[in-house]
Amino acid sequence: MARKAVSRKRKAPALPGAGSDAQDPQFGWDHSLHKRKRLPPVKRSLVYYLKNREVRLQNETSYSRVLHGYAAQQLPSLLKEREFHLGTLNKVFASQWLNHRQVVCGTKCNTLFVVDVQTSQITKIPILKDREPGCVTQQGCGIHAIELNPSRTLLATGGDNPNSLAIYRLPTLDPVCVGDDGHKDWIFSIAWISDTMAVSGSRDGSMGLWEVTDDVLTKSDARHNVSRVPVYSHITHKALKDIPKEDTNPDNCKVRALAFNNKNKELGAVSLDGYFHLWKTENTLSKLLSTKLPYCRENVCLAYGNEWSVYAVGSQAHVSFLDPRQPSYNVKSVCSRERGSGIRSVSFYEHIITVGTGQGSLLFYDIRAQRFLEEKLSACYGSKPKLAGENLKLTTGKGWLNHDETWRNYFSDIDFFPNAVYTHCYDSSGTKLFVAGGPLPSGLHGNYAGLWS
């Protein structure tokens, strides 16, 4: 009987959807889902293109903001100091970056100079005199303020007479004019409220509004073309207003610091009697309000944070954050933990407030987290152990101190004097921090300047 032939060919696996095997998990996925999707038709509308570009720019801007914020958060712990030697100059009170490598500074000894942060070269700038120079009798006050206008074409600072306002042209630092008929005491602070108008705050309790007109600028150019000797105009104040003195000691109503809110066209002012004053600035100065500060000793510095719509006010041991539109009891204050030495300078960069103290410290307050940045734990062998929760603190270097008669008679038994941070400023990239000052006691003569990067 013949044996039945058997085929040795393997059966092909059943296709999904063909019979009961279609439900097997091994074959349960649908190939049709993985077919190439048809792309939408390209829209050639100009409006569509512009809207797409706008969204893309918004995303790039948002990413850039996040990146800048992250850098501002991480930078302070990475900064390293490089000191500059300023010779025998006495106490740097004011500073501003002119460009990526030059910083202009003003001192207690009434010297205006530019330091090149790459070469350390110091260049002194001639200071401008009143039309009657013989009337200058005050000594030991110096240049307390330096400010650049929004377009960075003009610089305002103090003159040879500390009561007068001096204007220079940038980037050449050629003299433009002097406002010499306004204040009866030293100028402590300056704020530009437009490209051609600046406000000065004085120790006599007044605020002066000055305008650098096109006529003044044109005459300045013409005079420079004719004469090689610097020639400049003399201008008169556009307005002169006294801060309120009704409820305080009139002798202590000194305008110490100014800060401008460009969005609302409002100018904040701090006086040494512990008050904050707000002014409207539209071709003149109109008072809006005055409020008592929660910490009213040694209110010597003020800054405005545009993104946060708050003023930061420094006092003897605290930084207070003030929104003029909120009730005074809503003012938040933070303690620097360096009692007695005073907050000497304050600034905003992104969400970080940098605080310079009389003890030579730089502290960094995170306004979003509402706390000071803390030290990162160091695992390096031989390094000083850092306590958990300890504030991140940078300390200024030794600087220079004159061992004169005052030092020998009163301070020679003290080994080291910290250099108060009277001024600090970030460059446009936010990666370099210029810091300057000098010894805190008024009788001591010395200086400090350094680049932290």
Curated annotation (Swiss-Prot):
UniProt pathway annotation: Protein modification; protein ubiquitination
Protein's cellular compartments: Cytoplasm; Cytoplasm, Cytoskeleton, Microtubule organizing center, Centrosome; Nucleus
Swiss-Prot/TrEMBL WD repeat ranges: 138-178, 182-220, 250-289, 338-375
Predominant place of localization: cytoplasm
InterPro entries: Beta-prop_DCAF12, DCAF12, WD40/YVTN_repeat-like_dom_sf, WD40_repeat_CS, WD40_repeat_dom_sf, WD40_rpt
GO biological process: protein ubiquitination; regulation of autophagy; T cell activation; ubiquitin-dependent protein catabolic process via the C-end degron rule pathway
Residues in coiled coil: none
Basic residues bias (residue ranges): 1-12
GO cellular component: centrosome; Cul4-RING E3 ubiquitin ligase complex; cytosol; nucleus
Residue numbers spanned by region Required for nuclear location and interaction with MOV10: 1-38
Region annotated Disordered, chain positions: 1-27
Subunit organization: Component of the DCX(DCAF12) E3 ubiquitin ligase complex, at least composed of CUL4 (CUL4A or CUL4B), DDB1, DCAF12 and RBX1.
Family label: Belongs to the WD repeat DCAF12 family.
PANTHER family: DDB1- AND CUL4-ASSOCIATED FACTOR 12, DDB1- AND CUL4-ASSOCIATED FACTOR 12-RELATED
Protein name as catalogued: DDB1- and CUL4-associated factor 12
Gene: DCAF12
